[in-house]
Structures are given as structure tokens and as C-alpha cells.
Amino acid sequence: MTRNGRASGSGEAAASEAKARDAQDPEARARQICLRLLAAAPRTRAQLAQAMHRGGVPAEAAKAILVRFTDAGLIDDAAFARAWVESRHHSRGLSKRSLSAELRRNGVENEQISEAVDILDPEQEVATARRLVERKMASTRGRPPETRVRQAAGMLARKGYPPGLAFRLIREVMQAEGAEAAIDLDELNEPDVDLCDNDHTRDVGYSL
């Protein structure tokens, strides 16, 4: 057998031994799963529990590792939620409503979600929505006014902002740019404007 063949065989044997040890020690397997995921990005307790379940870790071993990692500060759902809110509000302009829904899907408890989204005060949320509208309206100049309204409203709706706020900000931005003569702005209060314009993709993806 060649030197490379011996090295390959030795590596395979070591891997087999490691798998055998993990099978005998489920906590070791649980620890390995959690450390691998946490090395890539922060994770919630629920995300790690789900990963261990998929990896065949017994519930008792998974619970023991979750407690140990939480006590060591490696799992901190409150810190995860705060970082999530700050990151995705500033990078994507998501509203409290959308941020809360995302955190809930990631397994964060309601109390921790409330504390995290309260980082954003109402004025900050409105200011972010206004910047989004200004950017969208600037990028759609020259298009029919009804199209501009629909696209701006759809963009805000997908980010979780309520229609009332969306139409108020669109009205204000259009008035500021002198476009109010091109469209009856009273129509912006009508509920039949398509908020989910199919020309635009939804905001998805759940990584910090």
C-alpha cells in the first residue's frame, strides 16, 4: 500500500472512531453540533435544539448541552434579538412588525422580542420608512404616478409598515417633489391599491 493509501486509511479509521465515540456519548455529539453552528453565526436556543433533534441527539442530552451553553453565555436569545433588530432595521429597513415575526420564527420568546424591538422608537421607525419612500420615488421618476404609488406602497408593505403610514409618507414625498398635480392624492387613501406589486421580490433571508 502506498504512503497516501496508508494516510487515507488512517484518516478514515480516525473518523470512524470519532463517530463511534459520539454514538456512545450523545452529549459529545450535541456539543459538536452546537459549536459548529455557533462558529458560523449566533443562534437561538430553539435553532440549536432543532439542529440537535435533526442530528438524532436524545432530548435529555440536548437539554443538558443547552443549559450548559446558556450558563456559559454561548446562547443568549436576548442578545441575539437585539443584534437582529439593529442589523435588519438598519440594513433592510424592516419595521417592528416584520422584525417581531422574524424573531418569532427563529424561536425567540415574546418577552425578549418586545424588549428587542423597543430599541426602535416610533420616530425612528417613521424616519426609516420615509427614507425608503424617498429612495423608491427617486428611482421611479418618469414612470406613471399610479405605478410609482403602487410600487412604493408595495415595498413598505413587504417590510411590515401599515398602509396608513405608507400612503401618508408617499403623499408627503410626492407633494415635496411637486408631483401632486399628476395624481389625485386623495386616492392614496383608497384601500384597493395593490400592496404586493408582483414586479418586486419579497424581503427574505434570515441571517444577520
Model-derived regions: residue spans:
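An alpha-helical, amphipathic repeat domain used for nucleic-acid recognition
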Residues: M1-L208
